[in-house]
UniProtKB/Swiss-Prot annotation:
<keyword id="KW-0963">Cytoplasm</keyword>
<feature type="compositionally biased region" description="Basic and acidic residues">
    <location>
        <begin position="101"/>
        <end position="138"/>
    </location>
</feature>
<dbReference type="InterPro" id="IPR023115">
    <property type="entry name" value="TIF_IF2_dom3"/>
</dbReference>
<feature type="region of interest" description="G5">
    <location>
        <begin position="573"/>
        <end position="575"/>
    </location>
</feature>
<dbReference type="InterPro" id="IPR053905">
    <property type="entry name" value="EF-G-like_DII"/>
</dbReference>
<protein>
    <recommendedName>
        <fullName>Translation initiation factor IF-2</fullName>
    </recommendedName>
</protein>
<feature type="compositionally biased region" description="Polar residues">
    <location>
        <begin position="49"/>
        <end position="69"/>
    </location>
</feature>
<comment type="function">
    <text>One of the essential components for the initiation of protein synthesis. Protects formylmethionyl-tRNA from spontaneous hydrolysis and promotes its binding to the 30S ribosomal subunits. Also involved in the hydrolysis of GTP during the formation of the 70S ribosomal complex.</text>
</comment>
<dbReference type="Pfam" id="PF11987">
    <property type="entry name" value="IF-2"/>
</dbReference>
<feature type="binding site">
    <location>
        <begin position="483"/>
        <end position="487"/>
    </location>
    <ligand>
        <name>GTP</name>
    </ligand>
</feature>
<dbReference type="InterPro" id="IPR027417">
    <property type="entry name" value="P-loop_NTPase"/>
</dbReference>
<dbReference type="InterPro" id="IPR000178">
    <property type="entry name" value="TF_IF2_bacterial-like"/>
</dbReference>
<feature type="binding site">
    <location>
        <begin position="537"/>
        <end position="540"/>
    </location>
    <ligand>
        <name>GTP</name>
    </ligand>
</feature>
<dbReference type="InterPro" id="IPR044145">
    <property type="entry name" value="IF2_II"/>
</dbReference>
<keyword id="KW-0342">GTP-binding</keyword>
<dbReference type="Pfam" id="PF22042">
    <property type="entry name" value="EF-G_D2"/>
</dbReference>
<dbReference type="GO" id="GO:0003743">
    <property type="term" value="F:translation initiation factor activity"/>
</dbReference>
Amino acid sequence: MSKKRLHEIAKEIGKTSKEVVEQAQSLGLPVKSHASSVEENDATRIVESFSSSKTKAPTNSVQTNQGVKTESKTVETKQGLSDDKPSTQPVAKPKPQSRNFKAEREARAKAEAEKRQHNGDHRKNNRHNDTRSDDRRHQGQKRSNGNRNDNRQGQQNNRNKNDGRYADHKQKPQTRPQQPAGNRIDFKARAAALKAEQNAEYSRHSEQRFREEQEAKRQAAKEQELAKAAALKAQEEAQKAKEKLASKPVAKVKEIVNKVAATPSQTADSRRKKQTRSDKSRQFSNENEDGQKQTRNKKNWNNQNQVRNQRNSNWNHNKKNKKGKTNGAPKPVTERKFHELPKEFEYTEGMTVAEIAKRIKREPAEIVKKLFMMGVMATQNQSLDGDTIELLMVDYGIEAHAKVEVDEADIERFFADEDYLNPDNLTERPPVVTIMGHVDHGKTTLLDTLRNSRVATGEAGGITQHIGAYQIEEAGKKITFLDTPGHAAFTSMRARGASVTDITILIVAADDGVMPQTVEAINHSKAAGVPIIVAINKIDKPGANPERVISELAEHGVISTAWGGESEFVEISAKFGKNIQELLETVLLVAEMEELKADADVRAIGTVIEARLDKGKGAVATLLVQQGTLNVQDPIVVGNTFGRVRAMTNDLGRRVKVAGPSTPVSITGLNEAPMAGDHFAVYADEKAARAAGEERAKRALLKQRQNTQRVSLENLFDTLKAGEVKSVNVIIKADVQGSVEALAASLLKIDVEGVKVNVVHSAVGAINESDVTLAEASNAVIIGFNVRPTPQARQQADADDVEIRQHSIIYKVIEEVEEAMKGKLDPEYQEKILGEAIIRETFKVSKVGTIGGFMVINGKVTRDSSVRVIRDGVVIFDGKLASLKHYKDDVKEVGNAQEGGLMIENYNDLKEDDTIEAYIMEEIKRK
């Protein structure tokens, strides 16, 4: 069967949804709102109930309006302006009036006042009668019904009087023009009938609702009493269980307490009687004859009783303040749990008394007392030094020792700490082999033969310029090779290669013999303590003499096993691949004797082989993993920078996700390009890696400043003497960091009397506009090694007349600079003051420095000028400008009477009223 919603039924029969809902509820249907659904038969019942109620409505209206006579009234209409033709028209029944609650209250109050005046003494004697409220309620209802009928009769009489008023004053009320009666709907009559039905329904159901509410309250009170009884019973059972576990004396005391607590049930009753204040009589004042004051006093008294009862109920329900209830057994006092003192205590400098108390499970007041007895005045928030903490622990009998602070920024601790590796997880790892030797003795050719790739043909001039790391496989085992350059300029790179290597292959040409770089390679290998395998190359040449090579090496401490030494000698031809297999077998044999082990389960640590800046990838570093396993997305600290491993490629250029021990990989994701030879370590999370990297960068910067600004007695004379020496300023830019260091070291070693090389700046990457600007300011020559300038840098260099030299072979660079130094003339300079300025205000900017706001009082201040800071007539600092601004724009000069801002290189102690003197050194042309 289909269902109907109540609002649909209301729409069909022309009733409101509220009426339909109330009618359905009166019929016993389980509905809640107008959206509830009922069956068709129930819907029929609802409709029929309304039809039956319509038939009863007139009788109800008659009953509610007893004594009201309906008369047909004649109303005078103003048709035209004459009084001769009055027209009469029957008026509809009077509109039933809604209940006037205000009038009812006033009438009820007046009736009560009259009754109290008439029977005041009788009411005082019978004020304890319990049934007086019910009688008063019934009387009030009767009076309200009578008043309501009286009000309606009065309103009807008023209407009749008004009609008479119209007749007396001969005024005709305006009426609408009559319309034909026809089948017109009388909306007023219908509204009156609906209102009468609502009043009848309300009066019929009000008593029922009141009874339901009272029943619900009684049920809730009953449930609350049951819950209290159950809780009390559970509490008594728990108390009995505790009493059984307690000792006998305590049990006897508790029995007495329980007996005493169980008897005074009358105490609670007496408290209630006292709270109801039954012993005090209620006095009603009769000063006001209409009884309004008595009514107000009674009302206030009832309100006070309600507040008092509510307060009492809250008091009884408040578990924290149940002082009057003794029907339950008192809770036993919990004793403080005793904690044993620790045997050892690890402290840090500056711990507070409260922290120490928490660690040793004692009250801070107890420790403060002990310190006072020791002669130390302290509060619980006061920090203590290490000696005081140790004395305090001695008083407690605890062995105290200071906590060892671990420097998270120290990467070297991973290499020095033997506990970092787990001896049970050590496994065999591939050997790291470094090929060393003199230039053009065939190192890259040997690697080319090993890897079957033409590496040597790609090097400019046939010389290896930077370290390469490669890995090959022989007899199922991997061997990692490091190719170090053989030129003398790359001494530091060879030293780095020897520090990470396990075996050194010293390659010597059979026709050239031992050369200076060969001896240097021997010394590096011996300093690193690694075994040496000598590969005598170019034995296919006609002038080859291997015996001479063996004897020359013996003079430098490298003795063949055939002569009773420890070094293996293998005669090879790298060009034709002769005896290469024998060389690899010798490497594996020596590696097996060395017992090379690694722990692959720890976080990776290792060394940077090479680093460079790539235009598309950013900082790229070649790493050699020495311990642990390096994974993609690992947070890593490399040298003085940090980052996350974004991508890894092996020596063949293939992407890999994991790199184990002795594996060379090239990674991206670093913030800056590190230095070749820096150590790296993987941290637990990126936050720790960032903190360690920033701390290392800060320490490196501080160390650099200390080195550049430190003047000692040993170098004081050299510093003063350096002013007489001419210098050639150069800026070095190269493709990799190793080439930058090697080129700078080679240029500084050039020995020309009276002239020295000053490397103003050296970095990795292409030559940019900043390098040109620096070269212009410092009068330097830019040397690019395997890099080219950007188009913007070339245009700026042409405009500023800055010289840029590009090279791909290191020999050419050294020769060119040496010739320039030999032909260097000694120019003369004189100082020229450009202008003076006064510091008006200073601004300190974090991570930038101190900015001085100034006004030029004489001359001008240019961007490339040197400045002196003069305070009270004394020169405080002499240096170069770091920046010069006019408002927010970078400018080359600030003129007289103009304001601007400046920063001075390596100086942040500017103060107001300091004098800035700008000057330049002009070259005096020789005549």
